[in-house]
């Protein structure tokens, strides 16, 4: 199994989990195709992490890309940046800028 992570990505975890659903239980080639046609920002980030995991597999163990499948995709919430938005009559409202930690694990098919 080969793992790649991206931490502190500026995308909401809830939206990233939607994009992660596109690649669960698929071969690496299918997952890359799904993510390349996705218009979500999280899809682009997950595709980079998936490419990194595949590169780890190819360089460390000489595993072919066609034999790999997505074993696990995890999207965890990272820290939040707290900002303030001005409101009427001198008020203000908190704004939470959410971040995500993305983890993709790929393995050989049949293991």
UniProtKB/Swiss-Prot annotation:
Keyword Transmembrane set for record: no
Subunit structure: Part of the 50S ribosomal subunit.
Cellular component per GO, a single term: cytosolic large ribosomal subunit
Function: This protein binds specifically to 23S rRNA; its binding is stimulated by other ribosomal proteins, e.g. L4, L17, and L20. It is important during the early stages of 50S assembly. It makes multiple contacts with different domains of the 23S rRNA in the assembled 50S subunit and ribosome.
Domain of life: Bacteria
Keywords for the protein's UniProt record, in alphabetical order: Ribonucleoprotein, Ribosomal protein, RNA-binding, rRNA-binding
GO molecular function: rRNA binding; structural constituent of ribosome
GO BP term, pick one: translation
Ribosomal protein keyword on record: yes
UniProt-recorded name of the protein: Large ribosomal subunit protein uL22
Family, per entry: Belongs to the universal ribosomal protein uL22 family.
